[in-house]
């Protein structure tokens, strides 16, 4: 009758498992130290760039330009302190500076987008390594933050910095546009006031030679208001009733013409303000839309990354299960042969 060797078999299996677990623990400890050292260096070097410094420089330039605009605004709107040539030169310089700052902002925005996408691809290519490290850390009851979460936090922070710069650029640009509009309004008013008076009728039948010689435009300069009133009364007394009617008609036509010009100027100013408001609204709307699109793209990248990571983990689990099944089968066969050998020897 065959003896019961099950207790001996269980002892052998326990000894083999203990030795294997001890060796795996030593190997995992050494490998974990090496990977922690390499990954800590990689995480530290991940954000070593001059993005924040460049953003700080751009913000400093915008603040300085805003100060310059505020300081020069009073002289800019005064014709006695600045000439038209100086104002045009200031407009050109300020416009060029704003364009350069906007290009710098676009460069920083594109750089951050490319850096974030490159970091996501790097995590995607090394996802198995990070998952192994995090699983070991969690087994040791240590709170660990995934490097991808750190990257997402840094990316959100930098997006906030870019939004702040965008608001500053819009504010400085709107300030510059406002003083340009005020200058345009003042110039239109001056042009309206300096419009030459229409000449009186040249018909010889309406005015005599004596009346033309003593007209107000050709009269001698007066020194006091009383002299001016006296001169005006003398001039009116020498004109005929028909001439007075003609002057009154021309005066009414001139007033109507000036009123029409004033209405046109007001309409133009209102149109300019409406255009500027629409431009600002469109700019804000486009900014919000671009931010929403960026968030959607980021969410899509995260979803794709999680799906690929899940597929890799699933394939890894399948391979591990297959290896475990094979090892179990081979172990059972070996143990069976070993038991038969012991039984044969016994």
Swiss-Prot record:
Spans through the membrane: 325-342
InterPro entries the record matches: Syntaxin-18_N, T_SNARE_dom
GO cellular component terms listed in the entry, alphabetical order: cytoplasmic side of endoplasmic reticulum membrane; endoplasmic reticulum; Golgi to ER transport vesicle membrane; SNARE complex
Gene Ontology annotations of biological process type: endoplasmic reticulum membrane fusion; protein transport; retrograde vesicle-mediated transport, Golgi to endoplasmic reticulum; vesicle fusion with endoplasmic reticulum
Keywords associated with the record: Coiled coil, Endoplasmic reticulum, ER-Golgi transport, Membrane, Protein transport, Transmembrane, Transmembrane helix, Transport
Cytoplasmic side: 1-324
Lumenal side: 343-346
Family label: Belongs to the syntaxin family.
Function: Syntaxin required for targeting and fusion of Golgi-derived retrograde transport vesicles with the ER.
Protein name: Syntaxin UFE1
